[in-house]
Amino acid sequence: MCGIVGYIGTEQAAPIILDGLSKLEYRGYDSAGMAIFDGEKINTRKAVGRLKVLENLTHGGENMKGTSGIGHTRWATHGAPSDINSHPHMNNAGTIAVVHNGIIENYIPLKKKMQDKGYQFVSETDTEVLAHLLDYYYKGNPLEAITKVLHRVEGSYALGIMFADQPDKIFAARKDSPLIVGKSDNGSFIASDVPAILKYTRTVYYVDNQEVVELQQGSLRFFSVDEEEIEKQPVTIDWDANAAEKAGYEHFMLKEIYEQPKTINDTISPRIKDNDIVIEELNMSDEEIKEITKIHIVALSLIHI
């Protein structure tokens, strides 16, 4: 899996993005990159290897100044691991940047059509098609361009997008690949998973399928793929950020194995009241619960209980 982190606000974006990407290393990757708007143009840095390579290249983000940006850790699907194939990808003018998780299934015919229109491709990726499609449809209205592109592509995606002439906004979109957004007093965030931004905010919104999000400093607007605005309710994350870290263990499998007693206790304890088990979310009586004959467990983890 790949990882996405985006930020727009009052703080320097690059260190925040690097920190967020470090919290997504468990997803696996072979390269990493960032795009940062410096007040005049979008600058990119990309590198094959561990995130540390990108951190060293950018001096921990200190030599990429700007308060808005998007970052990505890539696990190669279309195209070998290389600096060129790493994200972000740009349009030919360098005014639109895109990071993408997922697979664009119809990228080959789309790429041919864009090449016929004169667009120059520099990578082997399916993602670069998105940058050129956005360029083709962009007439000053980012939401319109994004939704037109989403109507044309087939497959799965989670996207982070920047336009150089929209310095106070970044955008996100999703279909079948996980994506969240969040906000704080100092800015707004995009992430593939909660741990990436939990250090900065506990107020998050889960982006649903075929939704587009416009992010500004401290504000979020949600739209359907048909450009209809959507009202969404935030979720407050109340679990400990340390649960997402390796906490000194060599790897996550060891951490999960040794944390089983605590995990069982943390799961069961809130459900015990007055020597009885209470699961209010089920909205079922004791008699109805006793009639249950089968329990199906679905889990996404190295282990499950």
What residue ranges belong to the model's regions?
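Conserved short alpha-helical segments that host acidic/polar catalytic motifs at enzyme active sites
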Residues: 1-255, 259-299
